[in-house]
Swiss-Prot record:
GO terms for cellular component: nucleus. Belongs to the ethylene-response factor family. Class 1 subfamily. The keyword Metal-binding does not apply. Involved in the regulation of gene expression during fruit ripening, by stress factors and by components of stress signal transduction pathways. Transcription factor that binds to the GCC-box pathogenesis-related promoter element. Probably acts as a transcriptional activator and may be involved in disease resistance pathways. Present in stems. Residues 186-198 have a biased composition (Low complexity). This is Ethylene-responsive transcription factor 1. Induction: Strong induction by ethylene and by wounding. The keyword Transcription regulation applies. Residues 106-164 bind DNA. The AP2/ERF domain binds specifically to the 5'-GCCGCC-3' motif. The affinity of this binding is higher if the seventh amino-acid of this domain is basic. Residues 186-214 are annotated as: Disordered. The lineage of its organism: Eukaryota, Viridiplantae, Streptophyta, Embryophyta, Tracheophyta. It comes from Solanum lycopersicum. It is found in: Nucleus.
Amino acid sequence: MYQLPTSTELTFFPAEFPVYCRSSSFSSLMPCLTESWGDLPLKVNDSEDMVIYGFLQDAFSIGWTPSNLTSEEVKLEPREEIEPAMSTSVSPPTVAPAALQPKGRHYRGVRQRPWGKFAAEIRDPAKNGARVWLGTYESAEEAALAYGKAAFRMRGTKALLNFPHRIGLNEPEPVRVTVKRRLSESASSSVSSASESGSPKRRRKGVAAKQAELEVESRGPNVMKVGCQMFQLASSYWLVKIWS
C-alpha cells in the first residue's frame, strides 16, 4: 500500500508583480499618449488607475499607438435644403350670392292679396276667437293701423299693436278699398289693356269676368272662390256660367 510521505517539500517561487511608479506625470514613459491625450489623470495610490495604466503600457509595448484610434477629420459641407415646390392649385371661383329681394315689413293682422292690396283682419275674443274682417287697404301701413285701432278697442292696453305710439292721436280712419272703387280701377285697367289689343268683344268679356271675380272676393275670406265662364247669346247679351 502506497503511503504518502509525512512531509512534503513545497517550493515557493516569488511572484513578480509589476510595480509602476511615476513622477508628476506619465509623459516620460509614454510620450505618444501625452501628445495625443495630454497628461492622464492617473493616481499612483489608486489601484484601479494602476490597472488601467498597466493595460496601456502592455498595449504600448506590443506596438499599439493612439494614432490607430484617431478618426480622420471629416469636412462638413453645408447641406442644401430643398424647398418644397409651391402648389399651383387653382381655387374654385367664388360665386357671389344673388342679391336678395328686400322684403317688406310684416305687420300683425295684415295679409297681402294676390293682386297687391293688403287685407286687415282680427280675431275677436268675445266671439271665441272668430276672425273679423276689417277691410282691404292700399298699403300695408294702412291695414296695420286699422288692425291696431280694432285691437285697442277690443283689448285696451293689453293689445299688441303695430304702431303703439300712434294710438290716441285722433288720426282719421284708413281709407278702405271698396268694391266700387276696385271695380272701377279694374274696369279701367281692363279697358286700357283691351283697347291696346283692339278687340271690343274681348274687352267686354274681360271686364265682365273681372267684375264677377271681384264681387266674389269682396264677400269675405270665408267665401269659396268660384269660377265663371261667359257665352255670347246675341250681339248684346251674355250668359255667365258660375261654378264652385
